[in-house]
């Protein structure tokens, strides 16, 4: 059996990460699967990506894709500021930010707005599961 390779001659398995521990059916795993597929199809080198995340269920997802890339899990709502700094000193990396509904639109709304205002060079994915799932008291 011949394995399918992308333009970089990498197997799709080179783009995966660890096994998910998220609740079945929330949708975050499907987002991770689509990130894997897009990065593989577009021939993006995993080592040239920096995954940034905040706090919450969504912040766990970077562990499930692009396992050979760089990553940083930041303080709740503050991921855009950390990404700004990392972006300024690491021009050779592409930044992929993953944040949840609470992390982005609640405590992090100010950070999010300023990242937009600064026109920060990153892909920012908001994963909305509709709850503050990891803090449990909000469910």
Placement of each model-derived feature along the sequence:
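Conserved small/polar residues in nucleotide/adenosyl-binding loops
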Residues: 137-139
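Thiamine diphosphate
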Residues: 55-133
């Amino acid at each position: 059996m011949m394995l399918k390779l992308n333009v970089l001659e990498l197997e799709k398995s080179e783009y995966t990460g660890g096994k998910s521990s998220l609740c079945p059916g929330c949708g975050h795993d499907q987002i991770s699967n689509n990130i894997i597929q897009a990065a593989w199809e577009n021939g993006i080198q995993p080592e040239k990506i920096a995954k940034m995340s905040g706090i919450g269920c969504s912040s766990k997802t970077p562990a499930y894709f692009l396992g050979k890339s760089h990553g940083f899990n930041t303080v709740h709502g503050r991921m855009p500021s950390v990404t700004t700094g990392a972006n300024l000193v690491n021009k050779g990396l592409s930044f992929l930010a993953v944040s949840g509904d609470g992390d982005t639109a609640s405590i992090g709304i100010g950070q999010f707005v300023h990242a937009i205002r600064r026109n920060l060079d990153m892909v920012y994915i908001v994963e909305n599961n509709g709850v503050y799932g990891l803090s449990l008291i909000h469910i």
